[in-house]
Amino acid sequence: MIESLIALIAAIVGLGIGYLVAKKINDAKYEIFVEQAKAKAKAIEYEAELILKDAKNSILNAELEVKKKYEEKTHKFQKDFNQKFDDLSKKEQKLQQEEEKLKEDKEYLCKSQKHIQNLQSDVDKLKNKYQEKLDDVLKILEHSTGLTQNEAKEIILKKVEENSREQIAHIVRKYEEEAKNEAKRKANFIIAQATSRFAGEFAAERLINVINIKNDELKGRIIGKEGRNVKTLEMVLGVDIIIDDTPGAIIVSCFNLYRRAIATKVIELLVEDGRIQPARIEEIHEKVCKEFDSAILEEGETIVMDLGLNKIHPEIVKLIGKLKYRASYGQNALAHSLEVAHLAGIIAAECGGDENLARRAGILHDIGKALTHDFEGSHVDLGAELCKRYKEHPVVINAIYAHHGHEEATSIESAAVCAADTLSAARPGARREVLEAFLKRVSELEDIAKSKEGIKNAYAINAGREIRVIANAQLVNDDESVLLAKEIAAEIQEKMQYPGEIKVNVIRELRAVEYAK
């Protein structure tokens, strides 16, 4: 019983202690929660103060920005207003000045009109007086000579007319001389201006190219076994290849600049590559021809761009680049055309013409020379037909005809091209007549050979002493080759004059190609 009581008391005491401990713990937690709540409240309050401060700063900045923009707009508006006000004031002042000037002009006109009326009155009086005097003279003449008044009047008028005609002729002759002298002086001034403002480079074209090689052993490889390589080179390239005792040099000779340039490039590539054989020669030749076509087009585009021209047909642009490989009387056709274009532009500008149109006509005036190796006819007709086909400006076509006297120049630009062409071609040292005669002769040789049916190509070599004719093996047999050679030789003998003899060499080669699959 006592133990139970003790246990009960212990339990009650334990419960009391537990309650007190729990209360203490709860009180401590409550205080912690309160402190945490206070801390959070302070943090929220601080954050709110920061937000409020930021908001105030933003509002202040916005107010300042608005104020700044307002001031800027106000300043700009005030500035514009002042500017417009000044403009209006100036216009008003100008109008007042013009009004005053008009008043002065009106007064001057009134005075002039009055003066004219007075002069007219004086003239009428003089006229009447003259008529009276004339009547008196006529009466005296009629009385003394027995002539009627009308007959006497005719004699006097005829005499006056003769005197007047002499005076007029003298005046006309005087002013005509002055006009001629002034025109000559002006023309000399314009030419001096043009030539002083443009100084073109000039280099005479040659008939040979020299290829430098590292050692003379390469000469043997270029010649090949029994001359096989050099014969293939000459046949494919259409040039003379001269391999002599000159150390470290091979000479390529041909009157055609284009063929000579291609031949030079092909041989240089073969020497660099080291594989010199007929198949490789043809492969390199085909590759170089494609490269030259691209280079010619690029050259034409560069020139057109440098001259500031536009809307030129691509085919004409390509032919402009091709002029680089044409020469006339030893003068490079492209260099000559560029010189004419620049000079014509300057002359046209000085005379009040269209400078760009004159440059266009100048660069195209000899465009037909790019076609003379491929088509029959003069370069004037070929160039004019080409420009008509691609709808070039009529002034350009007129300049092409006019610079060789086929037509009269119908514009300032055409006349400028004619003058520039003469300046470029006629200056000392610009052209060589002997070279041109030689080039014409070898061109005629090739044309005669190409005119025959069944001929693929023809090359004049050995300074025109030999014509190498490539026959189409499908159209010409061996017997016909002999006849072709005789026909070509007979036509050359009939149509051309030349010293010595010309060898006609007809080459027929048949290639059969098949592929193993």
Curated annotation (Swiss-Prot):
This protein's UniProt keywords:
Cell membrane, Endonuclease, Hydrolase, Membrane, Nuclease, RNA-binding, Transmembrane, Transmembrane helix
Question: Boundaries of each KH domain copy?
Answer: 207-273
Which Gene Ontology cellular component terms are annotated? Answer: plasma membrane
Topology relative to the membrane:
Single-pass membrane protein
CDD domains on file: HDc (cd00077), KH-I_RNaseY (cd22431)
Cell compartment(s), UniProt: Cell membrane
Q: Which residues form the signal peptide?
A: none
Q: Which residues cross the membrane?
A: 1-21
- What InterPro entries would the database entry show? HD/PDEase_dom (IPR003607), HD_domain (IPR006674), HDIG_dom (IPR006675), KH_dom_type_1_sf (IPR036612), Ribonuclease_Y (IPR017705), RNase_Y_N (IPR022711)
In the record, what terms sit under GO molecular function?
RNA binding; RNA endonuclease activity
Q: Cross-referenced Pfam families, in alphabetical order? A: HD, RNase_Y_N
GO terms for biological process, alphabetical = mRNA catabolic process
EC id? 3.1.-.-
> Can you give the residue ranges of the HD domain?
333-426
The cross-references to SMART domains, in alphabetical order and at most eight, read: HDc
Q: Which family does it belong to?
A: Belongs to the RNase Y family.
Annotated function = Endoribonuclease that initiates mRNA decay.
Report what the protein is called.
Answer: Ribonuclease Y
The gene for this chain is rny
